[in-house]
Each structure stands twice: as structure tokens, then as C-alpha cells.
Amino acid sequence: RIPFLMNFAKKIAIRSSKLRGCNMSFWREDFIKINGFNEGLVGWGIDDSEMIQRLHNIGIQGKRLKNTAIAYHIYHKEQDKSHIEINHIIEKETTEKKISFIEKGVNQYL
């Protein structure tokens, strides 16, 4: 993807409250403010969007970089999806109660 080609691409808002967890980066300070990923979530799914919601809850918005940044994906085996509904409930609670900090997160390792 080449920035020059962005001149020919569909224009989208640079700032956005809609983020996709599969390709994202953030400031370390903001990550620590929300205590990182919620390690209370089990299996595959929702961990990234739940964390993004907590970033939104402290006022952090994303910046879209479509066609202007390179993203790498590290291969990993798929995880168990049997807890996806429970994870959705936790994400919904994070949104409704405007939760910004979780107990079981990165603080365990700092």
C-alpha cells in the first residue's frame, strides 16, 4: 500500500470511534491506563474489541490508516470459541457501565 495511491481511494474520516482489533497500535501509557487486555476473557474473540471499548471510555479515538500502513500478522492456531457469548456479555457491560479499568490485566506483569 502506497500513500500516493490514497489520492485515488475513497476518502474516509481520519479519526474514528470504530476500530478493528486485528490491526492496531496504541500508546503504552494508554494501554497501562486501562490495564491492557482483559485476561478474564476466555478463548477466542472479543478481547480486542472489549479493550478498544475501554480505550474509548477514557476518550481515546482511533486513527484510520487504510492503504497507508503495513500490517503483519503472526500465525497462531485458532482458540476455543465456546465462551464467545460470555465474552460478548462482558463487552456489553464494558460499554454500558463505561468500564475503563479491569482487575486482571497487564498489571500482573509490570
Describe each model-derived feature in a short phrase.
Residues 12-14, 35-38:
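A short, structure-level motif marking secondary-structure boundaries and short turns
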Residues 52-54, 61, 72-73, 91-94, ...:
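Short, surface-exposed, polar/charged, turn-prone segments marking secondary-structure boundaries
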